[in-house]
Amino acid sequence: MKKSTTKEIVVTALIGAVIGVVFTLLDYAYMPMSAALGVVFMEITFGIYMLSPTLSMFLIRKPGIGIFGAVVAALVNLLLGSPYGIQVILANVLEGAAVELAFAIVKYKGNFLAFVLSGIFGAIFVFARDFIVFYSAQFQSFMIPLMVVRILSGIFVTYILVKLIASALKKTGVVKGFACAKDN
């Protein structure tokens, strides 16, 4: 597989930066929304947090791009004052690793299975961190339905957003020559 081009790296960084800003806005909306809707709100929005590595990997489909996009988004989110601190970096690295694994399994094809696996792996990887950090490794029965919602969001919210954004980027010509440009 060829190395990433300068254009691919720059586009990934720009996407990561924009998504990092979105994450920051969502972080501050999350506080009052979770108070009103409970912990399920985070699980419903999980797919949005999977956006940077998944969009980057869908567009370019080269090893390392998913983690790079995730780290850029996390750094921008952190620099803009995320209330979650350094945990943002860890969560995004885990999401990026999940997407990298999923796309490697499907041999870097941008098919629906890549999104399904990304959503499942991303939910599991980040839940493992949450389980240790936030739940003191104490299993509680409410975690099962939350995990199901997280997985579904990781698959469907991410899939819909990535497809919409990729379609818009194709129309601009920004992704001309990228792997996604060859898709129908």
What is each PLM-predicted segment?
Residues F46-R61, A98-V106:
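Generic transmembrane alpha-helix motif of multi-pass integral membrane proteins
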Residues G38, Y108-N184:
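Membrane-embedded alpha-helical hairpins and interfacial helices in multi-pass inner-membrane proteins
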Residues M31-S34, A73-L101, D130-F134:
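Interfacial aromatic-anchored transmembrane helix boundaries in multi-pass membrane proteins
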Residues M1-S4, E8, G38, M42, ...:
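Membrane-helix interfacial "entry" motifs
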Residues I9-L14, G47, L51, P63-V71, ...:
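Hydrophobic alpha-helical transmembrane segments
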Residues K2-S56:
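Hydrophobic transmembrane alpha-helices
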Residues G16-T24, V71-L80, G119-D130:
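Aromatic-anchored segments of alpha-helical transmembrane domains
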Residues V11, V21, L90-D130:
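Short helix-perturbing small/polar motifs within transmembrane alpha-helices
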